[in-house]
Amino acid sequence: MTCSQPNLRVTIIAADGLYKRDVFRFPDPFAVATVGGEQTHTTSVIKKTLNPYWNEMFDLRVNEDSILAIQIFDQKKFKKKDQGFLGVINVRIGDVIDLQMGGDEMLTRDLKKSNDNLVVHGKLIINLSTNLSTPNTNQANGLHRSHMQPSTSSGLVPQVSASTPQPSPGPSQADPTASNPSLHPQRVPSTTRPSSTIVPANGPPAPPNGQQGSRTNLSSFEDSQGRLPAGWERREDNLGRTYYVDHNTRTTTWTRPSNNYNEQTSRTQREASMQLERRAHQSRMLPEDRTGASSPNLQENQQQAQTPPAGGSASAVSMMATGATTAGTGELPPGWEQRTTPEGRPYFVDHNTRTTTWVDPRRQQYIRMYGQNANGTNTTIQQQPVSQLGPLPSGWEMRLTNTARVYFVDHNTKTTTWDDPRLPSSLDQGVPQYKRDFRRKLIYFRSQPALRIMSGQCHVKVRRNNIFEDSYAEIMRQSASDLKKRLMIKFDGEDGLDYGGLSREFFFLLSHEMFNPFYCLFEYSAHDNYTLQINPHSGVNPEHLNYFKFIGRVVGLAIFHRRFLDSFFIGAFYKMMLRKKVSLQDMEGVDEDLHRNLTWTLDNDIEGIIELTFAVDDEKFGERRTIDLKPGGRDIPVTNENKGEYVELVTEWKIVKRVEEQFNAFMSGFNELIPADLVNVFDERELELLIGGIADIDVDDWKKHTDYRGYQESDEVIQNFWKIVRTWDAEQKSRLLQFTTGTSRIPVNGFKDLQGSDGPRRFTIEKSGDPGALPKSHTCFNRLDLPPYKTNDVLEHKLSIAVEETLGFGQE
């Protein structure tokens, strides 16, 4: 029997991912709640959105057999035949809440079709509560997080938590049982749709066998193959890619867990995968590291001064003293002084530049650089007196081997090299320009005083199972100057001295954790499922700017101490770090659909076809705003004459302006360790290699998982292509990978797991183009358009030019 007084409070919180029936406009949705056809309540209308947020409450009279129906309509079409129907849910009250016992339940339901069978899409989140004593205006703010059902939406849960901002504890104060975990980085829910970030469960992981979730939303915990293992949830990102969330371990995967899933087996598999990634990460190097030798325990004695740098034979260039000198007689140049070490070895002080050297400035020593000419024979490339090169950079010293060969010691980093850091390039003319530039830039970059390790030690102690929080506390409490001291990493409960191995492990583990989309600070790009971009809605965590500053410090710290991070970003992110202007091409990795639409707009006549203004709609935590791209933009129509400006402004807003606050916080931390004027010597592709290193690429695996269009694997062009790739060194291969796929990163399981913008996408070589043209790349599809070149030499020449001269991450 129905109660005479209201006994249930229904809160219609939000809908997510509604179906868009019009190409160029969004609906104006509102919801209608009815019980038994007698009680009807209507929410307000939310303008222009697919993700409306109402958070409106209604008190109803119900019994356990009552059916609560909530329909969503588009107000703009409400007077039409279909009333702008967008979906409906029907809930039997007795199935979800015990009216006698009382309770509070959060429901997330898939929207269903009506009898008209119109296409619908999305979910609806509501709250049912028997507690009517609290004021309606505060009801939604008091929702019990422990009953909140994880949503496929990445834009709904934050709207609830954001309404009650509370101070977020620092990472070092993490508590798994915190009453408001959604504000902690390890519990932050993802915040935007569209987004491929992970939406963690608010509160405890899902109970075994779906005891709680099974009543409210079975579809998230099962698929066509049956029910998922306990604690697992199936979701889709905005690109329609299915991924799985393991709430037991707070991890995500693109692979469905098997029905005979075992947590221990899964943990073992994750450890094996992590070990593969660790080995790949630790094998990454840079060109300077490959040709010079590291000597961590360099001794300042004369005997070692006669020891040549190990690995010098790897260099393509030999630098030797000619033996031609002038007599070291007469007075020293003005400002110079001769001194003697305690061992009796003379050295010279230049008070003009405040530097010291073993070389007598009165002696005119010549440096001769050797390389190979086109015939493969050695020839002199350059010969010039040392005195004309100026002083060595701070912390550098020139020495001679016992065979009179010159080498250089960098006391800042305790490394040695055959290459004179003052020379523009010590590589032979046959080496590609980009490689000469990159190595030259590295030598210059690392020789600067701002990159010199300061005296003392910087101790960082962390727990492996709490590395994000501990690292935040340790790194943010220290000054930038302290972080420039020798880095000493200590893992709690483990004995060991850090001679490089521990710090490499530290950056490997930390980069896996802090860039995890689970925390909502970063999200996967539209290009694939392993490159990252800033989450524009990271503000669900009120402390997010502090975390971005921390992450900036970590990236700077890794570069400063010559360590690599196991994370890779979209090309536009590296451009932004270099303060370069982004282009429409960069949009491809951020929003492929928008990139395609903007490209169509540029290439076609839009007069009378589409109506656009210099404004965009943006949704943040349920609030939809119109943003002018230029003053008064919402009143300025887009025409064929100004559409180029429109595309440029939309691109800048989508890539830069939406995350400007987060990015500035990131750069403030980064520039505390790496000055902006120094990092700007690199281009965006070089910066990716500087941060992530250069991997050893398995050409056999690459070739094995390659498809061909218009070619056969046995064709001469294809045979020559792979022959050329095999002869290239690791850096050239990484450059080719950047050119064709947009990133130098290789999936953990090799090229078989290569991803494109629309899911798994194998590397493809297509027969396309005139033999006189350069190869082209399509990074969204991992495709190389390779013309049918007649000879191996022409192929190598054209391919090298395409790879080294391309400014962006691919030409199309």
UniProtKB/Swiss-Prot annotation:
Annotated Basic and acidic residues bias: 276-291
Positions of the UniProt region annotated as Disordered: 131-235, 250-350
Residue spans of biased composition, Polar residues class: 148-165, 174-199, 214-223, 250-267, 292-306
Catalytic activity as recorded in UniProt: S-ubiquitinyl-[E2 ubiquitin-conjugating enzyme]-L-cysteine + [acceptor protein]-L-lysine = [E2 ubiquitin-conjugating enzyme]-L-cysteine + N(6)-ubiquitinyl-[acceptor protein]-L-lysine
Residue stretches making up the HECT domain: 479-812
Oligomer and partners: Interacts with creD.
Entry similarity comment: Belongs to the RSP5/NEDD4 family.
Protein name per the record: Probable E3 ubiquitin-protein ligase hulA
UniProt source species: Aspergillus flavus (strain ATCC 200026 / FGSC A1120 / IAM 13836 / NRRL 3357 / JCM 12722 / SRRC 167)
Lineage: Eukaryota, Fungi, Dikarya, Ascomycota, Pezizomycotina
Gene that this polypeptide is encoded by: hulA
